[in-house]
Regions:
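Bacterial Sec-dependent N-terminal signal peptides
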Residues: 1-24
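N-terminal leader/targeting segments and the immediate start of mature chains
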Residues: 22-42
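Charged, gly/pro-rich active-site loop segments
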Residues: 23-24, 102-169
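A short, Trp-centered hydrophobic/proline-enriched beta-strand micro-motif
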Residues: 35-50, 89-93
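General beta-strand recognition
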Residues: 44, 68-70, 146
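A mature extracytoplasmic/lumenal domain signature
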Residues: 49, 73-75, 95, 108, ...
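Hydrophobic/aromatic beta-strand elements that line small-molecule binding cavities or substrate pockets
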Residues: 58-62, 106-108
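A short mixed-secondary-structure module that forms the rim of ligand-binding clefts
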Residues: 61-96
Length: 169
């Protein structure tokens, strides 16, 4: 009976160690994802409208560790209606060195919070928004991301090419 007890203890320790290792790996992936996202000059925002995906290049703001992403846009742009009708979005970021990427999936909402609008404003946008009241924010709560980074040896599956996926709490 004693050998069985020790086997159970060893298995329990291995499971705990494996779970801890996975948590550490996920945290490392999150750190690297933020590095790629925040170094990317532009991103590609994809919305869905009438069963068709529409993508456009966007100038995003830095993402904080809470994995909330903001974009500024014109209140009259098509993407605002797309998001109101279907808040599920995908955003793609290429690494600065072009040796990896992060693709996020999340839920978008529209924010007209004046403090946030002031915070997420670039002076060079004055020429695009002569009437600043047309400026609004898209807030994306990131739910998950896929990541590839040659620099950090994060690669897809050798057979399926499926990249690692990380869920955000």
């Amino acid at each position: 009976m004693k050998p069985l007890f020790f086997i159970k203890i060893i298995l329990s320790l291995l499971i705990v160690n494996f779970a801890s290792s996975q948590d550490h790996q996920e945290e490392k992936f999150k750190e690297i994802a933020l590095e790629i996202i925040n170094s990317a000059k532009y991103s590609v925002l994809t919305t869905v409208n009438n069963n068709s995906a529409d993508s456009r290049t966007m100038d995003h703001f830095k993402v904080n560790p809470d994995f909330i992403l903001y974009f500024g846009t014109n209140i009259n742009s098509r993407k605002i209606n797309h998001i109101k009708n279907n808040p599920i979005v995908t955003v793609h970021f290429n690494s600065k060195e072009n040796d990896g990427y992060v693709t996020v999936k999340g839920f978008a909402s529209i924010s007209s919070n004046s403090d946030l609008i002031e915070h997420y404003w670039k002076n060079e946008w004055d020429k695009f928004y002569p009437n600043k009241s047309n400026y609004i924010l898209i807030k994306v709560k990131i739910q998950s991301f896929e990541i590839i980074s040659e620099k950090h040896n994060i690669l897809g599956d050798s057979i399926t090419w499926k990249s690692p996926i990380v869920l955000i709490d």
